[in-house]
Amino acid sequence: MSELNMELKKLRELELKTQGLAARIQTAKSGEQLDVDLVQLQIENKKLKNRLFILKKSIAEESTAAGGDVSKPKESSSITEHLESVFRQAIASAFPEFRDTPVIIAPVNSTSAKFGDYQCNNAMGLSKKLKEKGINKAPRDIATELKGHCPASPIIEKLEIAGAGFVNVFLSKDYASLALSNLLRNGVKPPEVIKKRVLVDFSSPNIAKQMHVGHLRSTIIGESLCRLLEFLQHDVIRINHLGDWGTQFGMLIAHLEDRFPNYLNESPPISDLQLFYKESKKRFDEDEEFKKRAYSRVVSLQKGVPNSIKAWELICNVSRKEFQTIYERLDISVKERGESFYQSRMLSVVEYLRGKGLLEVDEGREIMWPDDTKTGIPLTIVKSDGGFTYDTSDMAAIRHRLEEELCDWIIYVVDSGQSTHFNTIFKAAERSAILNPLSHRVDHVQFGVVLGEDGKKFKTRSGDTVKLSDLLDEGMKRSLQQLESRGRDKVLTPQELKDAQESLAYGCIKYSDLCHNRISDYIFSFDKMLEDRGNTAVYLLYTYTRICSIARNSGEDFTNLPEILKKTNIVLDHEKEWKLAKTLLKLHDILIKCSKELFLHFLCEFCFEVCTVFTEFYDSCYCIEKNKQGDIIGVNHSRILLCEATAAVLRQCFYILGLKPVSKM
C-alpha cells in the first residue's frame, strides 16, 4: 500500500541516520573532538532508536495485515489501495525494472457503465520511461501487458483497455454483496493504516473570557479529526491548550482581592466572569496604583505564592465550568493542559536552546531564527525583562509532546492567522533537533473566519463578538420552530421532540462548518443550514430517519441481521441497487483521504452522495409492496438489508462528524 511504501522509505533513512550517530558516538568515545557533546549525541541516538523500534513494529503489523495476497481482500480493504496492490504486482511482473513506479488509480466519474468504476493510468508514464531507455512501446500495448499480468482478485469483475492506454476496472457484484453482508454482520470496520500516536491541539479558549464564535471552528474541527483518527485506531491525545497564564491574571487577582477580600475562606460568587474581566481591565487602564499591584501579583503568581495561586485557581475554575457546559452541549471531549503546565518546561527549553548556541541577543531580548539563513521573523524566546512569550511556550510544548509524550504526529487546529507563527515554530523545532521530519509529522490545520450574512465578521447587532452559548440557544430555538412547523410536536413524545431538537440544532451548526473547505471563510446562516434540501445536516438527518423507518414499517423483525443474512443474500441486479452498493464501498477510500489531507468536507460530500444515491434507489426500487388498501403484500428482504447497510455507513460517518441521528424526527 502507498502509505506503507512511504513509511518504509522513512525507515531506511532513519536507520542510516541512527547508524551515522552511532559512528559519531564511537568516534567521540575514542577521544576525538566533536562539535556536538557526546551526551547529547547519545540522547539523540536513543530517541532515534526508540522511533525506529516503533516504526518497525507498525510496518511489520501493517505488512502482515496487507498480506500481499490480493486474492483475499479483508473487510478493512480500501478499494483504491487494493487496486494499487493489484497493479503494483502487475508492473513488477511485466516491467521488473520499474517495480517502484507509483501506481495511479482513479475513480471513474462517468455516468456510463461502459467505462467501468476505476481506472489505472500508468501506461503512458511507463511508455515514456521505456522510451528513455530506447524502447518504443505504445501505451495501449503496455496497458494490455499490465492487464495480462494482473493477479486474480475477487474485487475485480473484469478489466478492459480503453482509449490511448487506460485500464478500466469493473467491480464485482458478488464481492460488493459479500462486503455489505459482512458490514451488517460485523459493523463498519476501519480501513487499515499504520498506527501512530497523535496529539490534537484544539479549542483553546482563554480563561476569564467567554467562548465565542471564534472558538467554534477549532472546537468542531478538532473534535471531528479526533473521532476520525480514533476510528482509524490511532492512539489519540486530545489537548485543550488553555490560555490560563500571563500578565492579565495579575489584574484579575488584584481585582478579586478587592471585590472578595474573604476569597481564601469563601468561594467568591462570580456570576459573570466576562464582566469581572472588563472591570479589572478598566481599573488597570485608569488606576496607576492598581496597575502596580497587578504587576506585583503577576510576580507573586510566577513565584508560586499560595494566596495568588489560590486566587488564580478560583478564577480558572469559574471559566472551566462555563467551558464544560459548552463542551457537554456539543459533545466535545478534550483534556485540559494550559500554558501554566509548561512554566517549568520553558526554563528547560531556554537552557536547551542556549546550550545549542541557537539564541542571539537582540536589543536586550534573546531571539531564535527558524533556520540558518536568518531570514523571516525570529522567535522571541526571552524578553528583555527576562520574561517568556507565546513563542517560548510553544517551543516548550512541542518539545514536551515529541520527547515526553513520544508523539509521532502533532496537529494544531488553529485559525489561518497563526500560519506564519506555526511555520516558524516547526522550522525552529527542526533546527534545534527537537523535531525530526523522518519520524515526526506536524500539521497546522488552519481555517478561515466565520462571517455574518452581510459577508463581514460575524458579530451581534451591537458589534460585539457572538457568544457561543447564545449561538447554541438560538440554534435550539430555530430547530424547535422548524419541527413545530412540520407538526412533529404533535407526533413525537416530549423526549423524542427534545432529542430531535438537539440533533437538528447542534448537528446543523457543526455540519455547516465541516461541509465547507476549512481554509475558506464561510457565512453563518441559520436559514440556510436548516434547509431540508441540498448538502445540509437537515437533509442528511431526515434521510437517515426515513431509512430507519423502512425496516420498522415492514411489519417484520430486522433486529437480528446476522440471522437474516443466513437466509437472504444482498442482490444487486437493479442499476440503482448496484449504484448504491458501489457508493457505500467508497467509505474506506474517503476516510483515508480525510486522514491524509485533514479535510473533513470530503466526508460531508460522501454523506450527501450516499443520501442522494439512496433517494434514487428508494424512488426506483420498492422495498415494501402494498395493495390498494394499504396492506403489505410483499417485503424485499435484500433491499431492506441494503437500506440497513446504508444506515450503518451513515451512522459511522455521522459519529465522526459529531452528528447525533435519531430514529424518529
Curated annotation (Swiss-Prot):
Report the PROSITE patterns cross-referenced here. AA_TRNA_LIGASE_I (PS00178)
**What is the enzyme's main class?**
ligase
> What does the entry list under GO cellular component?
aminoacyl-tRNA synthetase multienzyme complex; cytoplasm; cytosol
User: Mind listing the GO molecular function terms for this protein?
Assistant: arginine-tRNA ligase activity; ATP binding
Q: Where is this motif: 'HIGH' region?
A: 205-216
Catalytic activity line of the entry: tRNA(Arg) + L-arginine + ATP = L-arginyl-tRNA(Arg) + AMP + diphosphate
Query: Where, in this chain's numbering, is L-arginine bound?
Result: 204-206, 215, 390, 394, 418
EC assignment: the record states 6.1.1.19
Q: Which NCBIfam families does this entry report, sorted A to Z?
A: argS
Role noted for this protein:
Forms part of a macromolecular complex that catalyzes the attachment of specific amino acids to cognate tRNAs during protein synthesis.
Which PANTHER family does this chain map to? Answer: ARGININE--TRNA LIGASE, CYTOPLASMIC, ARGINYL-TRNA SYNTHETASE
The record's family statement is: Belongs to the class-I aminoacyl-tRNA synthetase family.
Can you name this protein? Answer: Probable arginine--tRNA ligase, cytoplasmic
